[in-house]
UniProtKB/Swiss-Prot annotation:
Segments of skewed composition (Polar residues): 333-355, 581-591
Database matches in CDD domains: bZIP_NFE2-like
Oligomer and partners: Heterodimer; heterodimerizes with small Maf proteins. Interacts (via the bZIP domain) with MAFG and MAFK; required for binding to antioxidant response elements (AREs) on DNA. Interacts with KEAP1; the interaction is direct and promotes ubiquitination by the BCR(KEAP1) E3 ubiquitin ligase complex. Forms a ternary complex with PGAM5 and KEAP1. Interacts with EEF1D at heat shock promoter elements (HSE). Interacts via its leucine-zipper domain with the coiled-coil domain of PMF1. Interacts with CHD6; involved in activation of the transcription.
Gene: NFE2L2
Organism: Bos taurus
UniProt PTM comment: Ubiquitinated in the cytoplasm by the BCR(KEAP1) E3 ubiquitin ligase complex leading to its degradation. In response to oxidative stress, electrophile metabolites, such as sulforaphane, modify KEAP1, leading to inhibit activity of the BCR(KEAP1) complex, promoting NFE2L2/NRF2 nuclear accumulation and activity. In response to autophagy, the BCR(KEAP1) complex is inactivated.
Name of a matching Pfam family: bZIP_Maf
Residues carrying N6-acetyllysine: K598, K601
PROSITE patterns attached to this UniProt entry: BZIP, BZIP_BASIC
Name the record gives this protein: Nuclear factor erythroid 2-related factor 2
Length: 607
């Protein structure tokens, strides 16, 4: 036999290759390319599709991140439902930006640079809690002559070292200027933070700093400041000090200041130590202010103690307050102007006429609210009703100091009180301000317009600002033809036209959104009703099913009882009953019952 040479089993033969080519040509003729059968080609296409899919997912993720970053810069308008750009926080300019001393402008930091904890740390580092009176005290002590050793002064001590006053003054002035520039820069940074813009922060030191033209003026300012800071401690002990100490104090202090400055300084110091306004000082504290020719800048201890006892022990009639300058709207401002014009460069909160002490606020609130029994709304109603210029109500009771018994008035005092009451009744009615520092009463009829403007929407405020003669409701709710006719009758500029179109567009969008929400709510309510109906029907069907199961179970029980009863009545040829394990009863469609054995051979017996 001839042996046939077979090709290796791993390689196809030439005949197989020809056959494969023939089959491929047939597939190509049928529209199938050869790449369909190429596994490597299909794998490359699969990898390419996978890369395209991953690239698409990456692009979608990038687009989502861009949209998220874009919407983070917008805020949702609850009124119209559209997104508006967030307005950056405006920088609050400092009150001392126009000062001649400090022309340095601090850079405005970003809103995220400083937080509350950083601000507190910055304040703690900038403002160390030490007594600033040490420098001024040392400066003043260097110019005060030596006090005898047998007099113990609680305020002044001997200078620790001998140094020329001019050198010390120049050093102190330079240090104070540097510190104040740093303080101004710190406050500029603090006021630019959005978290602290809601606070009405006022820097008294920066607002009340004046120029220092010469070392002599700086010396006067330092000494005057120390004199003011030591006045509250001297008030309690001025009656017990010896005349020798008072004379030494007056001589040393008046040698520095002129007569005009010392008299003006006395007025301001008494005004600030008593924490009252200049208007109240003219009425109640006239005995405290001494003339330069008589007291030489300092009140005597007898006058001081007598005036204090009269003021504290005497009754205060609230009807007299209506005659006071502080409660008079058209009182002259010459006294305040004189006090503001100071050459010593010291300001004791008298530059701002609207600033009042807490005592005045309490007194005015008691006088205007508690004793008269009026609230803000009641005062507005009284102002708005005609015929209320002159009213006679219950007499205002006098206020006595706590702990003192009420003493009966003498005949002269009663006559004077009656005269004052009649004068107050005949005087034209003037409204009581919130505090004596206010020039105008807050209870004016302008409140009604301001309250109405507070309830206006943003579109109404814009339309009012651009003087659009149509109401916003008319712009939104008019049909197209009526709206075009209304617009053709007026001439508008570009800003007004853009605002009108914007108002109408957003109003229509708002109405459409409301209608959409209304339809959705109606659909939700309808679905809830259908769901409740289906629940009721389900409960009803479950109840019927339970009843049917019960009746079916009862029928089966009755049927089994009947089956056993009929089966027990059957007998075989020998008169024996049939065994239920071997036979069973079956009923045909015509109603006949047969006894059928359970074996395969049916041995039927008809009854």
């Amino acid at each position: 036999m001839m042996d046939l040479e077979l090709p290796p089993p791993g390689l196809p033969s030439q005949q197989d290759m020809d056959l494969i080519d023939i089959l491929w040509r047939q597939d190509i003729d049928l529209g199938v390319s050869r790449e369909v059968f190429d596994f490597s080609q299909r794998q490359k296409e699969h990898e390419l599709e996978k890369q395209k899919k991953l690239e698409k997912e990456r692009q979608e993720q990038l687009q989502k991140e861009q949209e998220k970053a874009f919407f983070a810069q917008l805020q949702l308008d609850e009124e119209t439902g559209e997104f508006l750009p967030i307005q950056p926080a405006q920088h609050i300019p400092s009150e001392t930006s126009g000062s001649a001393n400090y022309s340095q402008v601090a850079p405005i930091p970003k809103a995220d640079d400083l937080y509350f904890d950083d601000c507190m740390q910055l304040l703690a580092e900038t403002f160390p809690f030490v007594d600033d009176n040490e420098v001024s005290s040392a400066t003043f002590q260097s110019l005060v002559p030596d006090i005898p050793s047998h007099i113990e002064s609680p305020v002044f001590t001997a200078p620790p070292q001998a140094q020329s006053p001019e050198t010390l003054i120049v050093q102190v002035a330079t240090a104070v200027l540097d510190d104040m520039q740093d303080i101004e820069q710190v406050w500029e940074e603090l006021l630019s933070i959005p978290e602290l813009q809601c606070l009405n922060i006022q820097n008294d030191k920066l607002a009340e700093t004046s120029t220092v033209p010469s070392p002599e003026t700086k010396l006067t300012e330092i000494d005057n400041y120390h004199f003011y800071s030591s006045m509250p401690s001297l008030d309690k002990e001025v009656g017990n000090c010896s005349p020798h100490f008072l004379n030494a104090f007056e001589d040393s202090f008046n040698s520095i200041l002129s007569t005009e400055d010392s008299s003006q300084l006395t007025v301001n110091s008494l005004n600030s130590s008593a924490t009252v306004n200049t208007d109240f000082g003219d009425e109640f504290y006239s005995a405290f202010i001494a003339e330069p020719s008589t007291s030489n800048g300092m009140p005597s201890s007898a006058t001081l103690s007598q005036s204090l006892s009269e003021l504290l022990n005497g009754p205060i009639d609230l009807s007299d307050l209506s005659l006071c300058k502080a409660f008079n709207q058209n009182h002259p401002e010459s006294t305040t102007a004189e006090f503001n014009d100071s050459d010593s460069g010291i300001s004791l909160n008298t530059t701002s006429p609207s600033m009042a002490s807490p005592d005045h606020s309490v007194e005015s609130s008691i006088y205007g609210d508690t004793l008269l029994g009026f609230s803000d709304s009641e005062m507005e109603e009284i102002d708005s009703t005609p015929g209320n210029v002159k009213q006679k109500g219950p007499k205002t009771p006098s206020v006595w100091p706590p702990g003192d018994p009420v003493q009966p008035l003498s005949s002269s005092q009663g006559n004077s009180a009656a005269a004052r009451d009649s004068q107050c009744e005949n005087a034209p009615k003037k409204e009581v301000p919130v505090s004596p520092g206010h020039r105008k009463t807050p209870f004016t009829k302008d409140k009604h317009s301001s309250r109405l403007e507070a309830h206006l929407t943003r579109d109404e405020l814009r339309a009012k600002a651009l003087h659009i003669p149509f109401p916003v409701e008319k712009i939104i709710n008019l049909p197209v033809e009526d709206f075009n006719e209304m617009m053709s009758k007026e001439q508008f500029n570009e800003a007004q036209l853009a605002l009108i179109r914007d108002i109408r567009r957003r109003g229509k969008n708002k109405v459409a959104a409301q209608n959409c929400r209304k339809r959705k709510l109606e659909n939700i309510v309808e679905l809830e009703q259908d769901l409740d109906h289906l629940k009721d029907e389900k409960e009803k069907l479950l109840k019927e099913r339970g009843e049917n199961d019960k009746s079916l179970h009862l029928l089966k029980k009755q049927l089994s009882t009947l089956y056993l009863e009929v089966f027990s009545m059957l007998r075989d040829e020998n008169g024996k009953p049939y065994s239920p394990s071997e036979y069973s009863l079956q009923q045909t469609s015509d109603g006949n019952v047969f006894l059928v054995p359970k074996s395969k051979k049916p041995d039927t017996k008809k009854n």
